[in-house]
Amino acid sequence: MNQYSEFHQLADQLMLYIEETLDGFSGDSDIDYETNGGVMTLTFENGSKIVINRQEPLHQVWPATKAGGYHFNYREGKWFCSRSGEEFFAKLSQAATTQAGEEVSFG
């Protein structure tokens, strides 16, 4: 498997996990998601969004949240922020919880 197809497989798995988690979300908030052209958009009741974009040339996933944008690299079986070292789903849970106004956990 070449490096680009491996990256796409890992990014697909990441987005599928997000979809499955949101499909099973039992909170009061309505969180919609849409994936188009490798870009996933989460839309919250208050109109705020989280956009998760693939950066194929860099082999990174870039989520943009209300609080800011982040770059994540895949290593040791997980995605980690290139600046803080924080794990992807921890950061996504934090951002989604803030934007939904209730706890949203992806991990």
UniProtKB/Swiss-Prot annotation:
CDD domains: Frataxin. The keyword Calcium does not apply. Keywords: Iron, Metal-binding. One of its GO terms (biological process) is iron-sulfur cluster assembly. Pfam families: Frataxin_Cyay. One of its GO terms (cellular component) is cytosol. One of its GO terms (molecular function) is ferrous iron binding. InterPro entries: CyaY, Frataxin/CyaY, Frataxin/CyaY_sf, Frataxin_CS. Involved in iron-sulfur (Fe-S) cluster assembly. May act as a regulator of Fe-S biogenesis. HAMAP family: CyaY (MF_00142). PANTHER family: FRATAXIN, FRATAXIN, MITOCHONDRIAL. Belongs to the frataxin family. This is Iron-sulfur cluster assembly protein CyaY. It comes from Yersinia intermedia.
